[in-house]
UniProtKB/Swiss-Prot annotation:
Segments of this protein annotated with the region Leucine repeat I (LRI): 75-135
Compositional bias per record (Gly residues), positions renumbered to this chain: 481-493
Annotated spans, VHIID: 154-219
Primary localization: nucleus
Entry's localization field: Nucleus
Region Disordered: start-end pairs: 466-500
Renumbered ranges of motif VHIID: 185-189
PANTHER family: OSJNBA0084A10.13 PROTEIN-RELATED
Gene Ontology biological process terms from the UniProt entry: gibberellic acid mediated signaling pathway; regulation of DNA-templated transcription
Role noted for this protein: Probable transcriptional regulator that acts as a repressor of the gibberellin (GA) signaling pathway. Its repressive activity is weaker than that of SLR1. Its overexpression prevents the GA signaling pathway and induces a dwarf phenotype in Arabidopsis thaliana plants.
Similarity field: Belongs to the GRAS family.
Protein name as it appears in the record: Protein SLENDER RICE1-LIKE 2
Amino acid sequence: MAQFGGFGGWSAMDVAAAAAAALGNVSGAVYHADPAAAVYASLVPGMAVVPGRAPPSAVQIEAARRWKELEKMALRSVNLMVTCAGAIQAGDYAAAAGSLSDAREIFAKMPTTRTGIGRVLTHFADALAERLFPAFPQSAPPPPPPRGEQRELFRGFYEAGPYLKFAHLAANQAILEAFEGCNSVHVIDFALTDGIQWPSLIQALAVRPGGPPFLRITGIGPHAAGNRDELRDVGLRLAEFARSCSVPFAFRGIAADQLDGLRPWMFQVAPGEAVAINSVLQLHRLLVDQDAAAAASFPAPIDGVLDWVASMNPRVFTVVEQEADHNKSSLLERFTNSLFYYASMFDSLEAISRHGGGDGAGNPLAEAYLQGEIADIVSREGSSRVERHEQMPRWVERLRRGGMTQLPLGATGLWQAAMQLREFSGAGFGVQENGGFLTLTWHSQRLYSASAWRATAGKKMTMMASGAADAMEESQNSNTNGGGGGSSGGGHGALNQIMQ
């Protein structure tokens, strides 16, 4: 089992088991921690007494003693932070503040919180502190980082490990297979960001037997800030790359803050185009509290988006999401589940660093990226909480209910993902095929799952009336906007069409 480099052999499973033990409940169904699988080494690596060998030296014995002290400190910290989360949930803020203060006192005595369990617990303590002592009024949640900083964090996380690389490869392979034999293809990307996913697809289409198709990409992204139109900038870069690969290409950007505000007519799908819709780590942002969803009489945002996705009848709808359970209404359950998950994430980042000859500190941008997710999960509630990760079984149920049928990600995708992980072969990553899905794993912990879908045949028929209504709405908007392209958010449309 993988171990944190900074704190005496503590693994991600150890963190989860300790958190569950603090609650007096180690049910795997709730906390995903199997106590039997937790490993608590009693000696520093290399300290085991083997017959025929010399007994441990005084230096080794002292190291073991210090290690045991650190182990006790880490366990005590986990217990205090779980107690803090439980007190917050119960409304006992004085007790919560006391537990958090005690945990921070322990952190101050630790030799380092740059690596290992100390680093993970520090991020969770910061999130609890933000929950207890918000720096902003309750009516105004903390604003997201500036857009330039968000891009930098995204790029840092992408480069730090196989996480987003796996997501893009699995999705692109499914799209490539869906476009086989098509001469005009259209990719709709729910979150274009810096367009880093698409050069590899363009390259694959360039060498396709029979020649490349005409490729159109519609990217959804933020509104232009100041004098800079980020969507257009990304489109220009993609157009130049497609030109270098001799792939006929067009780009269109749609500025939108919420996916549930979009409608099919906005994408201007041409007759005869084969459509692929791509969602990487975006659908969970459309979810609401599980308890609230069960009690609500109106559909959640995710339901409306899945309806119009199905109505567009794409050849493939690619979905990649965190393989995690962070959408519980209970803060205590969210806290323990996320502590387990992010302990594995930071463990894997440290292993990558050490595998590459580093000190285990890892990529600071990737750390900040994950820290932002932790803060959202732990410190925010209601509409301000967007990192609502759920596990694949719930996504399967939701997507099928939304009129989608699963397309298996076959052996080719599995082989390519495994080949991509060769760079990290010594770090403990793997790829599993689970019922047609591909899952990136860190030892036994599942991190991200990729899946592919298409509209169910019966659903297509029920959506015909919706399609006619969309066509009428498109006509009305074209008349209102003077034929400006029908993109949401204004400022994008004909001006954001970039063609080779």
